[in-house]
């Protein structure tokens, strides 16, 4: 499809995504406050992810990213809403990359918590204060790695300046060069028929893949171990087992959503230039997916956790008594969850 059509789709997804993200996450935060009293420290993880999702959606709305793959180069281009320096634009793009990486890392932490709750309950103390505060510090390491390589290993050069100008002129001719900032992932170039590989850029991509792979391995291992343990142990109450299964189903779906909307598109984003696959403006399907992701992910929790779902349904139907009953049921159920 043409660049103009893709920009229309991306901008529409931006509006839909930020609206959905705000509505769903505010509802989830309200449910956590009124129905999550006895959910333990897990409610803090869900609350953090909700707040982060809102923040991520705001960043995307401000930066208005577009993506383009052409001539062994992947371009992350941000359309400026107001004028600022090239250096600040580079920092903004790297910060967007940090938010992108955070979504992977936090998903992994969710699975670690459920793994501890089901398989290693004695380790749940690591999610209590004050050690709970160490988790953001640990998560910041891979996030900082991702953002740092995006900023330092992909400098603007004469080639990238000419390349991004050519991309804008050929595919997005209504966007002026001075109104964008960008990061160009150049894998290699051909000069006089000889291929010159950019080792720094390939190293940066390796770091990105390492972070993605590690978070995916953590989710897969913890998810499998949790499922196996739940099926082996029959000595827990029906209420506890039911709630554990609801939370596990939510996490499984919360793995599928980022896999479809984040992992798979990002994998294509980094692999296509290496094999000289010119997706051109079609690479914007990655942005399209990323705009919708922050609103879809927390929606899973609301739909899967029965008491959350019933509370919303009863509220919409005006059944106050049922809502109060749901609150009591929620407290009874969640009191069974390890904290």
Swiss-Prot record:
Bilayer-crossing regions: 12-32, 43-63, 93-113, 132-152, 202-222, 255-275, 285-305
Induction field: Induced upon exposure to the volatile odorant diacetyl.
Extracellular side: 1-11, 64-92, 153-201, 276-284
Pfam family, one: 7TM_GPCR_Str
Keyword list, A-Z: Cell membrane, Cell projection, Chemotaxis, Cilium, Glycoprotein, Membrane, Olfaction, Receptor, Sensory transduction, Transmembrane, Transmembrane helix
Known role: An odorant receptor which affects chemotaxis to the volatile odorant diacetyl. Specifies AWA neuronal cell fate via the odr-7 pathway.
UniProt name for this protein: Serpentine receptor class r-10
Lineage start: Eukaryota, Metazoa, Ecdysozoa, Nematoda, Chromadorea
Protein encoded by which gene: odr-10
